[in-house]
């Protein structure tokens, strides 16, 4: 006990409650600090694994979703500024101009640098790898990008088995034409050459479709209804609006002149049309880059669908594989074997040719 005098009166201060309060405050602080030391890495993940030779796929899924969404914000920002600074990378094999904009470059820098900082030993391929990034970009992992009911386990694999494919802006030509519905940003994670995680983000409607094969998927994909077409119903084939001649002719040759054709842009968008049952198949007859198709391949696989070359071969996405698929592709949610059989019959009838 201690005492002091004020206005001639003696005041006694009881130190016991103050001591108890100090002890309780210390306990709370210790608990808080321990929680953040032990639990935060489990939730948010250390930026780099304790074992740099291993990669946690749960963290990679979170990072892939964030990367695609952050890239999408860059695309939106450039679109709103109306300062696209369009230049040409040349022409495609079909003679179509292949444009490049500031949105492609800015999205690339945000997406690839962010992923590479978190996973420094993983091989990451981006469509715009030649682009020089003037600024350094990074972000912390945020698990809130996953919906609450997502069943996402902690699974680790060897870093050397992982390859990431990034498309910073799919459908650039349509982006310059303000056909924004076709525009997507995409990330795909392949393990041992096969796609296991796919993310397709649509910046202009805010929808992010993601799937981890055998584990979980976004609420949007989980809420889709399975196909319910009749057996004899004509299929709806989605083909590219930029180079449609070969695909249209092949579709008519296989399924008849009355086949329904849905022209669209962007490989990511066309896969989303298949998974949403707006198209029964996505047909592409010329070469296509793997960052355009890897995410869609993973999502289709997670939903029970299939993507193959026109020679009915699964597509490989390993680090030593060519970044270009030269054998065309057929992507379906169901009846893949049936459509492939019809394609083989057409090829046989035309001396092995598809056009």
From Swiss-Prot:
<dbReference type="GO" id="GO:0006796">
    <property type="term" value="P:phosphate-containing compound metabolic process"/>
</dbReference>
<dbReference type="InterPro" id="IPR050725">
    <property type="entry name" value="CysQ/Inositol_MonoPase"/>
</dbReference>
<feature type="transmembrane region" description="Helical">
    <location>
        <begin position="16"/>
        <end position="36"/>
    </location>
</feature>
<dbReference type="GO" id="GO:0016020">
    <property type="term" value="C:membrane"/>
</dbReference>
<dbReference type="GO" id="GO:0006021">
    <property type="term" value="P:inositol biosynthetic process"/>
</dbReference>
<dbReference type="GO" id="GO:0008254">
    <property type="term" value="F:3'-nucleotidase activity"/>
</dbReference>
<feature type="binding site">
    <location>
        <position position="167"/>
    </location>
    <ligand>
        <name>Mg(2+) 1</name>
    </ligand>
</feature>
<dbReference type="InterPro" id="IPR000760">
    <property type="entry name" value="Inositol_monophosphatase-like"/>
</dbReference>
<keyword id="KW-1133">Transmembrane helix</keyword>
<protein>
    <recommendedName>
        <fullName>Putative inositol monophosphatase 3</fullName>
        <ecNumber>3.1.3.25</ecNumber>
    </recommendedName>
</protein>
<feature type="binding site">
    <location>
        <position position="292"/>
    </location>
    <ligand>
        <name>substrate</name>
    </ligand>
</feature>
<dbReference type="GO" id="GO:0046872">
    <property type="term" value="F:metal ion binding"/>
</dbReference>
<dbReference type="GO" id="GO:0008934">
    <property type="term" value="F:inositol monophosphate 1-phosphatase activity"/>
</dbReference>
<dbReference type="GO" id="GO:0005737">
    <property type="term" value="C:cytoplasm"/>
</dbReference>
<feature type="binding site">
    <location>
        <position position="170"/>
    </location>
    <ligand>
        <name>Mg(2+) 2</name>
    </ligand>
</feature>
<keyword id="KW-0479">Metal-binding</keyword>
<dbReference type="GO" id="GO:0046854">
    <property type="term" value="P:phosphatidylinositol phosphate biosynthetic process"/>
</dbReference>
<dbReference type="GO" id="GO:0006661">
    <property type="term" value="P:phosphatidylinositol biosynthetic process"/>
</dbReference>
<dbReference type="GO" id="GO:0007165">
    <property type="term" value="P:signal transduction"/>
</dbReference>
<feature type="binding site">
    <location>
        <position position="127"/>
    </location>
    <ligand>
        <name>Mg(2+) 1</name>
    </ligand>
</feature>
<keyword id="KW-0378">Hydrolase</keyword>
<comment type="similarity">
    <text>Belongs to the inositol monophosphatase superfamily.</text>
</comment>
<feature type="binding site">
    <location>
        <position position="127"/>
    </location>
    <ligand>
        <name>substrate</name>
    </ligand>
</feature>
<feature type="binding site">
    <location>
        <begin position="169"/>
        <end position="172"/>
    </location>
    <ligand>
        <name>substrate</name>
    </ligand>
</feature>
<keyword id="KW-0812">Transmembrane</keyword>
<feature type="binding site">
    <location>
        <position position="292"/>
    </location>
    <ligand>
        <name>Mg(2+) 2</name>
    </ligand>
</feature>
<keyword id="KW-0472">Membrane</keyword>
<keyword id="KW-0460">Magnesium</keyword>
<feature type="binding site">
    <location>
        <position position="169"/>
    </location>
    <ligand>
        <name>Mg(2+) 1</name>
    </ligand>
</feature>
<dbReference type="InterPro" id="IPR020550">
    <property type="entry name" value="Inositol_monophosphatase_CS"/>
</dbReference>
<comment type="pathway">
    <text>Polyol metabolism; myo-inositol biosynthesis; myo-inositol from D-glucose 6-phosphate: step 2/2.</text>
</comment>
<dbReference type="Pfam" id="PF00459">
    <property type="entry name" value="Inositol_P"/>
</dbReference>
<feature type="binding site">
    <location>
        <position position="167"/>
    </location>
    <ligand>
        <name>Mg(2+) 2</name>
    </ligand>
</feature>
<dbReference type="GO" id="GO:0012505">
    <property type="term" value="C:endomembrane system"/>
</dbReference>
């Amino acid at each position: 006990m201690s005492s002091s005098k004020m206005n001639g009166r003696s005041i006694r201060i009881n130190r016991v409650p103050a001591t108890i309060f100090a002890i309780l405050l210390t306990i709370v602080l210790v608990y808080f600090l321990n929680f953040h030391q032990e639990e935060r890495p489990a939730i948010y993940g250390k930026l780099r694994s304790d074992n740099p030779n291993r990669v946690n796929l749960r963290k990679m899924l979170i990072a892939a979703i964030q990367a695609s969404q952050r890239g999408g914000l860059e695309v939106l920002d450039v679109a709103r500024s109306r300062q696209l600074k369009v230049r040409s990378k040349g022409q495609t094999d079909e003679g179509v101009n292949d444009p490049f904009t500031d949105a492609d470059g800015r999205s690339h820098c945000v997406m690839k640098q962010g992923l590479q900082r978190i996973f420094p030993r993983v091989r990451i391929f981006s469509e715009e790898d030649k682009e020089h990034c003037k600024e350094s970009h990074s972000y912390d992992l945020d698990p809130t990008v996953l919906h609450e009911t997502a069943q996402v386990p902690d699974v680790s694999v060897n870093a050397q088995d992982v390859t990431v494919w990034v498309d910073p802006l799919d459908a650039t030509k349509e982006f310059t034409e303000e056909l924004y519905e076709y525009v997507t940003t995409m990330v795909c994670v392949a393990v041992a050459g096969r796609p296991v995680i796919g993310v397709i983000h649509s910046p202009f409607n805010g929808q992010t479709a993601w799937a981890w094969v055998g584990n979980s998927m976004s609420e949007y994909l989980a809420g889709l209804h399975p196909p319910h077409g009749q057996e004899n119903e004509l299929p709806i084939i989605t083909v590219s609006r930029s180079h449609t001649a070969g695909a249209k002719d092949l579709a008519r040759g296989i399924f008849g002149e009355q086949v329904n054709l849905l022209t669209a842009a962007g490989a990511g968008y066309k896969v989303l049309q298949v998974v949403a049952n707006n198209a029964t198949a996505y047909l592409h007859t010329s070469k296509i880059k793997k960052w355009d198709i890897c995410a869609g391949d993973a999502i289709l696989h997670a939903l029970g669908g299939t993507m193959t070359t026109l020679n009915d071969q699964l597509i490989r996405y390993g680090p030593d594989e060519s970044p270009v698929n030269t054998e065309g592709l057929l992507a379906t949610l169901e009846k893949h074997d049936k459509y492939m059989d019809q394609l083989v019959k057409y090829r046989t009838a035309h001396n092995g040719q598809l056009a």
